[in-house]
Amino acid sequence: MTSRFGQLTYTSFDAVGTVGGWQVKETSDALTPEETQLMLAGVRTVFRTVEPMPDYPTPEQLEAAPRRLAYSRVGETYAALWHTVPAGADSTGRPGNVFAHVLLDRTPDVAPRHRAIQWWRSPHWLCPYGATAVSRAALAEPGAEPGRVVTKDSVVAFALDTTTWRLATLFGLLDAVAAALDGGPPVVLGVESPDNAAQWIGLLSFLMSPGTAAQLSFSTFDRADQLNPHSGQMLSAVPLEDLSAVPAGMVAISEAETLSLGELGGEPHRTAGGYAIDVTPWSAMAQVVVLDPGSARRLLDDIDAVAEQVRDSGLHPAWPMAMAVAGRAEFADAEEEAHEVIAAHSPPGVAVGSAAARTISGVLSAAVGTTTADAWRAVQELPTGPGAVFADTTYLCRAVTDDEWLSENSPIPLGPRMFHGKPIPPPLRTAIGRALDPGRGPQRLLQVADLLVRAGVEDPRIRTTLVEDVVPRLGDAEVRERVGADARLTLGAVLLNDGDANGTAIDDGLLDWLADTAPLPPPDELAQATPWDRTWTIAALRGVRARRRGTGGAGQDAGALLWWLRATGSADFEQTATASAWNPEDLLLAIGADPLPGAAAVRTLVAAADSPALNRLAAKVIDENGDTLAVACAAVRTIEPTVWLQQRYVETHQHAYVPLWDEVLSVVDPADVHPDFSTRLLAFALLGLFTGHPYPRACSGFAASDRLGGEAIERLMPLVGEGQLAPHAVVAIGLLRAAAPPDPAHPDVTLDELAGHLAEQVATGMAGDDNDVDGVVAVMAQLSGDSAEPALRGYRKMVTKLLARRGDSPSLTARLRGGRQA
């Protein structure tokens, strides 16, 4: 069987058959490699005393020499103590050797439990000095009991030494250590000697429970340059002369300088070096109870007795003291602070009937008083903890049965802590039974239900009461008039929050009354709502009504219909979203952060006007890349012609998108296509035509519209002005397309004519000299592949005529085609 303790020594020595130098000298109790590494991680091989050791110290000098005891939890379940002493010169004559003796506690949370500092100057620590003594030092079984230097008696005598005033330092140290235990900055204590450090650490440790003291990592001797704020060591003692060199991020306190005491709820303590330390009830109680040796000594025993009555794990450092103070007349001046700590930090699972349970019960009962107002005051004032939970329960128990409280407050107030997902405390379950008495009337029952639902209480009796005792009475208009908006929404939430997405338990008249409680929230508010809060419930009621009326009758609640289908996970959502064009805000609201299913956004992308919401929808479609039809349409809505050309999408994407655009336009009624989409797609078609890439044939219908064609040309003219579309090439292509005989396989006459219009506008901006004529003719010859003289003469004639008659009506294209339909 593995023993509780394991030991290891580490030093610089030279043994027969080994290489000299720093190494593990000896281990005991079957240490595993993992345990050995944990122990070695805390070993210090440098020990710089303030005063150098004599070359040949006497036994008395060795006994009085500084030593370092460090403690920490290690690994997941272990604790370790590192005892380090100067060891003189090693076997090579090198001075400055150190001897480290490490003790590993494998079960530190098992009785008997001692404060780690009680092992200070324990006789089992090996303290060899000199190479010979180091070589002979051998481990023995650790004693069952710790040392006798740091005890309850010693720390009380130390704190209340009449020759040295230490209490102010103690009070500041208590609060600084409490903060460190709670994740605050580590504390550095400047001391005259390591022995003083041990008594300070002992005093702190005995003023908290053994389990909490086991979480306080410390060292009795370090130098300032060895400190690290992030090492995990909460309390470090250094020589007084090192205090000025303590690194930033640590709270430095000197035992030799006066600490200015603060006040609980007011000014903080301040050290001589200017460090501010927030005052806590722990030090406030200590200022009352640690004044007399007799009472202080009894207090330490009481702290341990309290800790034995509960599971001593994770206790707040001040809680055992508070429990010891509560109810004792001699400590009456600390009772308020004690009650505050007990209410905030009492642990769960205290044995029923124990003295601790009776004390806690008495404190909590006093905190909530006797009335609903008293309990409400406690809810507001008590910090989060068991006391607050008790106050919350007591308040709700009283509020739901207090007609006067329910009548005077609207809405009934609630504290910051709710009961969502928690079991109903037995006292509250009993109070709910009384509060839901049908004889109280529908208005009062609705108030009670509203309060309970808002508090997060889940009790089937609430819905039963509403369905059986409230809903039948709501046909009376006078009864409805007395029901406030909050109660109406609570009723709606309870009736719907039963897996009935269609609200079958609510008739049409009641549903209209509930849905009209408030307007549909704007999308930004609904996006932040949580299920069954006020905003969410309003939308749910309107969504249920819209679903009942159908898409055609939803009216202004069409968005609520779509949102409700999505919120309830309806299988109809994708079909409904895909079948119609929606306000982009409504579609975005319905889908939230989830991916858009299938082609749900296609009709909206084609039929909606340009808007910021549509831009967000299109960007979401492109980012998710979940449906090719939707992505192709989203590209039309978000990408400008300039970007389409600059990024070469006309080369890389347009070939793939053209059949998708044609497919969409073949199933969407032309009357449903928004002009903003038509114009953008027509501009892409012209880009394809002028760059020799495919374009959607369905655009011919858009090109027949003077307005759409003109807007598409306006989108492309900046590309010509910037030189991204060469003017000579635009004119050349426009003339060639206008003069070409009709192709029965591709009757894109209107698109060709639109290209001719663009060519005419470009020509209007030309100088019209021989350079322009020659440039356009050269491009025409290159594109047609015919550079014979007759062809060149014909091209020159066409260009010259265009430049000569710029701005004439009808256009050259119309004359070449014999006219066109407007």
From Swiss-Prot:
This is Putative ESX-1 scaffolding and assembly protein SaeB. DNA conjugation in M.smegmatis is unidirectional with distinct donor and recipient strains; mc(2)155 is a donor strain while MKD8 is a recipient strain. Mutations in a donor strain that alter DNA transfer do not always alter DNA transfer in a recipient strain. It comes from Mycolicibacterium smegmatis (strain ATCC 700084 / mc(2)155) (Mycobacterium smegmatis). The lineage of its organism: Bacteria, Bacillati, Actinomycetota, Actinomycetes, Mycobacteriales. The gene is saeB. Disulfide bonds: none annotated. InterPro entries: GAP1-M (IPR045401), GAP1-N2 (IPR045402). Disruption phenotype: Loss of DNA conjugation when disrupted in recipient strain, no effect when disrupted in donor strain. The recipient strain secretes reduced amounts of EsxB. Disruption of the probable saeA-saeB-saeC operon completely blocks polar localization of EccCb1. May be involved in assembly of the ESX-1 / type VII specialized secretion system (T7SS), which exports several proteins including EsxA and EsxB. Involved in DNA conjugation in recipient (MDK8) but not donor (mc(2)155) strain.
